[in-house]
Amino acid sequence: MAHSTAHTDSAAHLVLSLSCPDRPGIVHAVTGTLARRGGNITESKQFGDSSTGLFFMRVQVLTTVPRVELEKDLAELAGEYEMEWSLDEVGRAMRTLIMVSKEGHCLTDLLFRARSQGLPVDVVGVVGNHETLRDVAEFYGVPFHHIPVTKETKEAAETELLGLVDSLNVELVVLARYMQILSPALCERLHGGVINIHHSFLPSFKGARPYAQAHERGVKLIGATAHYVTADLDEGPIIEQDVTRAGHEDSVSVLQAKGQDVERRVLAQAVRWHTEHRVLLNGHRTVVFA
């Protein structure tokens, strides 16, 4: 039987996500710690991966205890269980920087969702290596930063980008069809905090002209993949994928239009899950508590 969760106006709704080596008693230890602080768990999911020996957990909890006190308890628990963990407010808008080149379908979708509160993101800026999408960003009242990239200026451009990330207190970078490869050093610096949308159902059709490749192969499904960015091009841990039907009569342009619809959907879902702390890294894979 469904029931409402009792809480006061002063209660904080927090989300705890964690990973650690798997062993007996983790769930009991975590929930016990929350219960001793008067926490009321509203959502809980966990997963033990026998192939890696790691345990993953996500808990939403209502509590009137000051957050700093709860964090102190969790830090002690983390030391005992070798946990990597984070604690945040449920629904808090994550400070996000979007990077683009010339195609605007993903940017427009993300900005609309952010403005209409359809995504828990605070878009603090848009970076483009071309000026093409400045008008789109400014239409939504978001500052646009033009950082051109050439082979000769790549290092300086990435230094400028990192300065922007630091000055704006950016928590998440989204590559919304940004057509430049990030250096290994930049990938390492922003590890786990950069999401890319790839215009195919990885690992198929990597590189340029994916829809032309798909057309040449006569595929019956086309898709898109959102993944974390690593130094290995298009090989980062996958967060979300989806597909749509393709017909023998579809031209390259029709396939591209269908694919762009999927790209928008997949990227928005990946961003949502990341900002809601539903995605945990598991080596080269992810655990997604959808």
Task: Identify the role of each PLM range.
Residues 114-122:
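A short alpha->loop->secondary-structure connector
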Residues 1-94:
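A conserved regulatory-domain signal marking ACT and ACT-like small-molecule sensing domains
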Residues 40, 84, 122, 143-145, ...:
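Conserved beta-strand segments of alpha/beta enzyme cores
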Residues 105-115:
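Histidine-anchored nucleotide/phosphate-binding helix
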Residues 96-105:
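Short, glycine-rich nucleotide/cofactor-binding loops
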Residues 121-132:
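Short internal beta-strands
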Residues 130, 153-159, 168-290:
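Donor/substrate-binding cores of folate-linked one-carbon enzymes
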Residues 138, 142-168:
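Adenosine-nucleotide cofactor-binding segment
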